[in-house]
Structure formats: structure tokens, C-alpha cells
Curated annotation (Swiss-Prot):
Protein name in UniProt: Glycerol-3-phosphate acyltransferase
Record-annotated membrane-spanning stretches: 6-26, 56-76, 92-112, 122-142, 150-170, 171-191
Cellular localization per UniProt: Cell inner membrane
Lineage per the UniProt record: Bacteria, Pseudomonadati, Pseudomonadota, Alphaproteobacteria, Sphingomonadales
Organism for this UniProt entry: Zymomonas mobilis subsp. mobilis (strain ATCC 31821 / ZM4 / CP4)
GO MF annotations in UniProt: acyl-phosphate glycerol-3-phosphate acyltransferase activity
Membrane topology: Multi-pass membrane protein
Catalyzed chemical reaction(s): an acyl phosphate + sn-glycerol 3-phosphate = a 1-acyl-sn-glycero-3-phosphate + phosphate
Cited Pfam families: G3P_acyltransf
């Protein structure tokens, strides 16, 4: 099997895993509600919380983080197996992670209308380089707590993780790939938050704890 075909298969695996809309599934199964008809219409944990089900929101957050991490870990395992068999293998881990992030934002099952990718990118960050995951989580929580804006927390976390990757100890080639893919995910994440950014600038963004 060619390297190109392997990369396509890894990307497809990551995308399909990332495209599973856990927020929508959980809200429908246990909350009897279509989360797309609630609040912002997003399928992520923040909007699931607006249904009044903190338990489902927590599960959504867990699974959205988990699918990003799992995509990276599966690709890492495959790369290691390939190395054991052939003596060489490309680093496909972050390709799978970026694909999972893309799948969450643009899931094929929902007409390519998905979430904003914060939790999934957090999972990718933890699995790709745990330091980036810690930086992401701390920056997300602190900025959300200080500003009381969930959107601000997610955007600051993604930017902080990308900056941290610039100091990642790795070969030049791997380092450049990580910087490029983390930067790409952050740019897309900010684009997915463009509505939030407009509301922040106009003073109309909902704060954490505000009634919907």
C-alpha cells in the first residue's frame, strides 16, 4: 500500500470518528430534544447545557474530547505497527487529529453543519503533545472564568495551544507539521466563532450563567 493511500485512510478514519455528533445523539436519546433547535443551534457541550441537562453536557464534552484524542492515538498505534513491520513510517498522528477536528466542524451526517471544534481540538492537543493539551485546558478555563464568555475561553485556549507547539521539542520537519496543522485548526476554529466575535464586539454575546 502506498504512503498516499495510507494517509488517505488515516484521514478518512479521523474524519469519520470526528463527525460523530455526540451532543445531538445524547440530547435526542436522553433529553428528547434536538439540540439544533435550542440556543445557538450548535451541537457542542455548551449548547447541550442550554437544554438544562448538565449531565448530558458533561458527557458531550467528554466524548467530543475523547474522539479527538482517540483519532490521534489510533493513528499513532498504526504508525508504530507500520514501523515495526517496515522499519520506517510517516508520522500520521496529527493528520488524523486534524481530520477529526474537521469532521466535528463539518460532519457529513448533518449536511456538513457541525460544531465549533473546541473540545475536539482539546482532545487532539492532549493526545498529540500533552503539554499543548494542558496549556489549552488551563487557558480555556481561566479565560472563560475571568470573562464569563465560553466562546472567549475556547478561542484563547486554541491560540495558546498553538503558541505552545512552537516550543515543542521535535525534529524540524515534525515541528513544522505540528505548527502548520495547529495553526490551521485554530484559524478554522476562529472562523467557526465568527458569529460569537461579532456579538462580542457589539456587546450581545451571552455570558456563562445568563438565561437563554
Amino acid at each position: 500500500m502506498s504512503l498516499e493511500m495510507i494517509a488517505v485512510l488515516i484521514f478518512t478514519m479521523g474524519y469519520l470518528l470526528g463527525s460523530v455528533p455526540f451532543g445531538l445523539i445524547l440530547a435526542r436519546l436522553f433529553g428528547s430534544v434536538d439540540v439544533r433547535q435550542v440556543g445557538s443551534g450548535n451541537i457542542g457541550a455548551t449548547n447541550v447545557l442550554r437544554t438544562g441537562r448538565k449531565d448530558l453536557a458533561a458527557l458531550t464534552l467528554f466524548f467530543d474530547i475523547g474522539k479527538g484524542a482517540l483519532a490521534v492515538l489510533l493513528a499513532h498505534g498504526f504508525s508504530y505497527h507500520l514501523y515495526q513491520q517496515t522499519g520506517c513510517a510517516p508520522d500520521l498522528t496529527l493528520i488524523a487529529g486534524a481530520a477529526a477536528f474537521l469532521g466535528h466542524c463539518y460532519p457529513v451526517w448533518l449536511g456538513f453543519r457541525g460544531g465549533k471544534g473546541v473540545a475536539t481540538m482539546l482532545g487532539v492537543s492532549f493526545a498529540a503533545w500533552w503539554v499543548a493539551g494542558v496549556v489549552f485546558a488551563v487557558a480555556w478555563l481561566l479565560s472563560a472564568k475571568i470573562s464569563r464568555y465560553s466562546s472567549v475561553g475556547g478561542m484563547v485556549g486554541a491560540i495558546a495551544a498553538t503558541i505552545s507547539v512552537m516550543f515543542m521539542p521535535a525534529s524540524h520537519e515534525i515541528h513544522q507539521v505540528y505548527i502548520a496543522l495547529f495553526s490551521g485548526m485554530t484559524i478554522l476554529l476562529l472562523w467557526r466563532h465568527r458569529g460569537n466575535i461579532k456579538r462580542l464586539l457589539s456587546g450581545q454575546e451571552s455570558r456563562i450563567g445568563d438565561p437563554q
